[in-house]
Amino acid sequence: ILFIPDPNLGGYVAKQLPEKQFAFYHGGCPRHIVCSAADVAKARAAHPEALLLVHPECRPEVVEQADYVGSTTGIMAYAEKSDAKEFIIGTENSIVEHLSYVCPEKRFYPLAVQLTCMNMKLTTLMDIYHCLQGSGGEEIILPQDVMQGAGRCIRRMVELGG
């Protein structure tokens, strides 16, 4: 399996599928890869009662120390349902803000200060609204031969994937 774009997420998935062979592309989320074991130690020292919830795109040494590893949606659901009252969140900082809003009786701390993703902030609610209305964004029309070639590749990947 050629796993792109993130080798950290790919490695996490590969551990769950040991019967498969993986090749990883050297890319990754610039926010998640900045989290380090030192950040975990610092956050746990500052908040010893807090559970550590991280995204699997974090470095393996961070993921290995987590109390929960999951998607952004999974992290939010875990924190909302948990009886714990404090959490260290290892994903984009807007999740800390969201959880603080929906669970005001709980405390949420970012794993690292540099987890704000400016690229994610480029898309606004109005952008999404306009897109859903069909009036936003740029329409890209590909040549028929490009679409046919890409379609063959996609169909073959689906066939091989079972």
Residue ranges and their predicted role:
Residues 1-162:
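The feature marks the mature, well-folded catalytic cores of soluble enzymes
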